[in-house]
Each structure stands twice: as C-alpha cells, then as structure tokens.
C-alpha cells in the first residue's frame, strides 16, 4: 500500500505538473491565436483566409476586432470566412459590422454575414435580414431564412411565410424550418429547434 505521506507528496507533484502543463498549453494556444491574427494581414491570400477560418474555430474573443477588420479585406474569400468566424465567436461587437456587410455587392459576403448573424442570435439583426429573403441569389435567401429561424422572433413570420412561395425549393425549405423553429420557440415545445435548422 505504501507510505501515505510519500503518496501524498507524489500526488502534489502530479497536480503541480498537470497545472504546469495546462499553463503551457494555454500559452501555446495564445501564441497560436496571435499567429493567426498576424496572418490576417499577410500578403498571401491563402494565409489570410485560412487564418480567418481558424480564428473562428479557436473561439477566442481577442480575435473579434481583427476579424471585423478582415471584413474589409480586398478578397471576398477572406471577408466571408471572417463573417462566419465572427458568428462562431458569438461576440455582439460583431453585430453592427455584420449588419453593414449585408449591404455588400458580393453574394458570398452577404451569405457569410447572414450566417454570422444567425449564429449571434441577436434580435437587432431581424430587420436587416428580412430584405435578404428577396435577394437575387438563392444562397443568400436561404441563409437569411436560416438566420431568422435561429434568431427565432415572430416578427420575421410574415416575411418567412411569403418566402414559402420562393422559386427555389431549398429556400422554401429553409423558410419552413425557420417558421417551425419560431413556432416551437414560442410554444416552448423545443427550445433548441432553431439550432437544428
């Protein structure tokens, strides 16, 4: 069985070692995030879009402002991934920049911004998202419907109901799922319904 005092000493050393390793892991994670943030301004397009995507997966709030700046990158590859990553981070500092990005001429940035707003689930995005249900690009319309369902406010109900007659089946399906999510949220049947869209 061993000497309890010796075993206690070993346990303490193990805990200290674990804490030390955890601190080292956290330090490496912070360095990795700083590296990705630096890559957002790299001359290489591939480096910038990969960094924008990685920062969303890292989930660190220190990336919010750099990703907001990346919404203005000259290439849409970076812009739309920055928008998606901002949604993944879930920080409301991204709300206004994402709403502004909905006005872009590029369908990919509008799509990424709508997706990001859906992930944020902030009621202030409802009115800016509704016009996208009539966007000329079906991917934008579909993503806007999805986002409105995720937000789950009945103020979007009339516009989503109108979208049930969209020419594209996938847009109609997204609108129906969004309406179901709003209904379920209101009745309390399935509070997570919006996340299943």
Place the predicted regions along the sequence by residue.
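N-terminal "cap/leader" segments of large eukaryotic alpha-helical scaffolds
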Residues: 2-42, 50
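Amphipathic alpha-helical scaffolding segments comprising HEAT/armadillo-like alpha-solenoid repeats
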Residues: 6, 27-41, 58-72, 91-103, ...
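Core register positions within helices of long alpha-helical scaffolds
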Residues: 23-27, 54, 85, 116-119, ...
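Positions within the helices of HEAT/ARM-like alpha-solenoid repeats
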Residues: 46-48, 77-79, 108-110, 139-141, ...
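Non-membrane alpha-helical segments in proteins
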Residues: 49-54, 76, 80-85
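Helix-adjacent hinge/juxtasegments
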Residues: 88-90, 105-109
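Strongly charged, low-complexity linkers/loops
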Residues: 127, 135-146, 150
């Amino acid at each position: 069985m061993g000497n309890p005092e010796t075993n206690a000493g070993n346990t303490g050393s193990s805990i200290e070692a674990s804490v030390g390793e955890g601190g080292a892991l956290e330090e490496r994670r912070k360095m990795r995030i700083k590296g990705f943030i630096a890559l957002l301004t790299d001359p290489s397009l591939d480096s910038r879009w990969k960094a924008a995507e990685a920062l969303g997966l890292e989930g660190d709030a220190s990336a919010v402002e750099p990703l907001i700046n990346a919404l203005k990158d000259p290439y849409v590859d970076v812009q739309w991934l920055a928008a998606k990553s901002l949604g993944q981070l879930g920080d409301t500092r991204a709300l206004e920049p994402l709403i502004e990005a909905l006005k872009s001429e590029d369908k990919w940035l509008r799509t990424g911004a709508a997706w990001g707003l859906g992930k944020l689930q902030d009621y202030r995005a409802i009115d800016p998202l509704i016009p996208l249900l009539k966007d000329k690009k079906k991917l934008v319309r579909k993503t806007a419907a999805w986002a409105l369902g995720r937000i789950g406010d009945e103020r979007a109900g009339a516009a989503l109901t109108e979208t049930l007659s969209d020419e594209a089946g996938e847009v109609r399906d997204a609108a129906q799922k969004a309406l179901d999510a709003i209904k379920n949220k209101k009745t309390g049947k399935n509070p997570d319904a919006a996340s299943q869209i």
